Amino acid sequence: MISVNDFRTGLTIVVDGQLYRVLDFQHVKPGKGAAFVRSKLRNLRNGSVNDKTFRAGEKVEKAQIDNRKMQYLYAQGDEHVFMDLESYEQTELASSAIEYELKFLKENMEVHIQSYQGEMLGVELPNTVQLEVTETEPGIKGDTASGGTKPATLETGLIVQVPFFVNQGDVLIINTEEGSYVSRA
């Protein structure tokens, strides 16, 4: 058990039998009445984000999340196959469980798979990934002076806004949290 006073961003807890990750929290001490903790929680099973208020000092169960390093192998219909790098055991995850992460996954990429009591929860991506541009308008000389952007389709199907000097075939570094262009690789 952990006190809500000890909340921190990224902490995984169990509330009412549901598994949540703390996205944001704020300790509130009103002038009148008891202190409380206002929090924003993401349900790890269905992805919904909920606001929940706890009384100061209230205890919640801390969840033990297992992180295993795995390699993304391939997609088979609606399932995606990952291989444990230590035991070579293969695990399948449904597309619906990793819908956002699929925009950044490419074959043979190493990721961390999160599980709770044997139940696979999802994929933890690295902060940045390198993806190749498969389609974009060609850059025209002199375009960089205006500092504008254009859409580019990457090898995973993700569409990001990139500077005019980026061309088809370039490898880009993409921020996985925001889904945005960082730089050329």
UniProtKB/Swiss-Prot annotation:
One of its GO terms (biological process) is peptide biosynthetic process. Gene3D superfamilies: 2.30.30.30, Nucleic acid-binding proteins. It comes from the Bacteria. Belongs to the elongation factor P family. HAMAP family: EF_P. Involved in peptide bond synthesis. Stimulates efficient translation and peptide-bond synthesis on native or reconstituted 70S ribosomes in vitro. Probably functions indirectly by altering the affinity of the ribosome for aminoacyl-tRNA, thus increasing their reactivity as acceptors for peptidyl transferase. This is Elongation factor P. It comes from Lysinibacillus sphaericus (strain C3-41). The gene is efp.
